[in-house]
Amino acid sequence: MGLCSKITATLAAISMSLALCSCDSSSTLPPPNKGDNGSAESDMTEIYDYVRSYQTAYIRSLQLPSGAIKDKGVDNSKITPYFAHFAVLALLTEPTEPNLSVVKNYMSWYFSKLNGSSTEYNSNEIAGSVYDYFAPNETTKGTYDSVDSYAATFLEIAIRFAEVSDGCVNWLKSHKSELSKITSAMVKTIDCAENTLPGENANDGLSIAHYGYPVKYLMDNSEVNMGLKAAIKLKSKGLIDTSSDLEALLAENTGSIRGLYNESKSNYNYAKGNTSSWNKFYPDATAQLYPSLFGVVPASDPKSKLVYDKFNSSFSDWSTGKMYGSFPWTMIAYAAAVMGDKERVDAYVTHIYGLNVKGEQKENWYDAEAGALLLAIDIIRNK
């Protein structure tokens, strides 16, 4: 039986198995048909299709009835909105009705969890922020990893959803107040004249992670740069209200991110005031990929090519599946796709296929890992 035929024959079983299974991501999918030895097919199109179908089904399986998307398949999984956002963005690369249903249900859940200016955990909260939760009962400790990136990546979801159809735009119009609040939350983390932030107030256009952790990270700011672009587009479609000069904030943020480049080290500071070492995988080296990944600096820019080449010199085996930390870090494959590195992306997707075709996931495989891989496939399959 050909690979594409196997996909068609097993997708329904995959989805049902995922929905019923409560084990971790390493064993959520059924084994392949008998006789399949799990070796990679030479036809990358079929390999892409298989992995795409497999990971899409996995992401869908993580959604709770409330619309929340769990980090992974265990019953008591954490629910980290930031991770879910990359999974949702991946579904939007294939805007079928089933995928759009998952996206809408997730967006509705996120809207329902927007914090006000005061919560039981924080009397001075940033309105429009969202806490992390825990399945199965969606309890929270009133904490988040960041405010800036959660908001920015959600705004990117919103604009990509709006670009699907007029019906999607109309649905978003009914949530204009929520989208405006999310935009405000992102803007409130930016060091600019309209804000007074804890720590440094340099009016440099860089965002801090949140008020309890006023660090200006390169990764977060690259995502905020994307979020500002999304907010500008949303505003042009009448989907948000804001008095902030988004274009000016974008220009300042872009200039300051580019200013984090350290000529003496041939890399970007991973945060303002913090130099990076090519010997440290996270956050130093991984951060180098983010300016080009999120369009702050074009992939064709010499600096983008330089840091990408240096990353691969320092961590040369990522495309074979080697993990340099606790997680697979498929954002590397996503960045490689943006850089047009088809050879390495093909190698990594083939590695994942070798697991998926045996009914396995890579260790510590989260929703964001599946999402970033699908985003990489969407870019590179046409190159």
Residue ranges and their predicted role:
Residues 88, 155, 162, 225, ...:
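Heptad-repeat amphipathic alpha-helical coiled-coil interaction surface used
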Residues 47-56, 69, 74-82, 139, ...:
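Extended ligand-binding clefts on enzyme/binding-domain cores
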